A protein has these predicted regions:
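Nuclease-adjacent, charged terminal/linker segments that flank catalytic cores
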Residues: 1-157, 161-170, 177
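Detector for Asparagine
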Residues: 4, 23, 28, 99, ...
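A generic alpha-helix preference that emphasizes hydrophobic side chains
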Residues: 134-137, 184, 264
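Acidic-basic catalytic patches of nuclease active cores, encompassing PD-(D/E)XK
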Residues: 162-222
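Catalytic core segments in nucleotide and nucleic-acid processing enzymes
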Residues: 199-321
Length: 321
């Protein structure tokens, strides 16, 4: 028996309730989250300004030592430059820019020769310097040091540009953290224990759960090639036996209908890879909050994927938790 995928008569009502829940969260918490991020970004911009001599001494060596400032530099131009636009304008390798803007580990390309790296970074510097927004960084044309007010003002402007470019990921990340917290509180109330330091998916004890755990799967049914796929939540029920697979849950939130229907194949692909590896008895469900319409739900249901609505988290009990 399914949880929600076999109850289409309730889908519209649940979608409406889920939208209301998402919108209430967005109105109450999104502005605060955005402001906090802007404050953090402003501090990062001020740091980048100091490192570059307030953009008057930007050089390949500085970029090499501080690759993390590249997104800030892109937002310091007139007009601000998208990542791929910078690659085209500067005529540099896309992989270099991607490595420098890696959020987890910003770095220059390790296998690139010193000469090539210096040439590539020089092209980036020339492009940025040529397009610096002199209306924001008013001291550059005047060839002087900025005062504290000018630094703070310019940092706020660039931080706003950064946050504007990142607004969807900022909100999505905040919502994901909130969803994981809701699940954690629910499982804790039932006596479950979280693996806070990581665990292999096939070594979980009964009555435990973990977040953002990799599960190794076959890429396709007729292939021996394997890949790690991250799963938001793994739960091993109290009554689980040795060798049982944990319950797998993917958290999903959406602030509009368009994006969910663009991305719905991702879950179906993940489900198919899990079935290719572990058989038909895999439990892989979604935890939904927001704009998920009948088109999305019908697609997932046809792929054998069930879901739990966040506004009715008690449905999780039907998983045997």
């Amino acid at each position: 028996m399914g949880i929600n995928r076999d109850k289409p008569d309730y889908w519209k009502k649940d979608t409406a309730a889920s939208i209301d829940m998402y919108n209430e969260w967005f109105m109450n918490f999104a502005p605060k989250t955005f402001r906090e991020t802007r404050v953090s970004k402003s501090a990062s911009v001020e740091s980048a300004l100091r490192v570059t001599g307030y953009l008057q001494h930007l050089s390949p060596d500085i970029l090499k030592s501080h690759p993390e400032i590249l997104p800030i530099l892109r937002m310091s131009t007139c007009p601000p430059i998208a990542r791929d636009r910078l690659v085209g304008l500067a005529g540099v390798r896309k992989s270099l820019v991607q490595n420098m803007e890696d959020t987890e580990n910003p770095r220059v390309s390790p296998r690139m020769s010193e000469k090539t790296l210096k040439d590539e970074l020089g092209k980036i510097v020339n492009t940025i310097c040529r397009m610096i927004d002199s209306d924001v960084f008013v001291w550059i044309d005047e060839k002087r040091e900025p005062d504290e007010v000018e630094v703070a003002r310019s940092a706020t402007i660039v931080a706003d540009r950064l946050c504007g470019a990142l607004s969807d990921p900022i909100i999505r990340n905040a919502q994901e953290k909130r969803q994981l917290k809701v699940i954690s509180q629910y499982l804790d109330s039932k006596g479950y224990t979280e693996y806070k330091n990581g665990v292999k998916f096939d070594e979980m004890e009964p009555g435990t759960y973990s977040f953002r755990t990799n599960v190794q799967v076959k890429v396709s049914a007729d292939s021996e090639q394997v890949a790690n796929i991250p799963v938001d939540v793994l739960i091993n029920p109290e009554g689980a036996k040795k060798g049982d697979l944990p319950i797998m849950i993917e958290c999903k939130s959406a602030g509009d209908f368009a994006n969910v229907n663009k991305r719905r194949k991702e879950e179906a692909t993940k489900m198919q890879q899990l079935k290719n590896t572990f058989g038909e008895n895999v439990v892989f469900d979604l935890f939904l909050c927001g704009y998920f319409d009948s088109a999305y739900l019908g697609y997932e249901a046809a792929e054998g994927i069930d879901w739990i609505w966040e506004h009715r988290i008690s449905d999780m009990d039907l998983l045997g938790i």
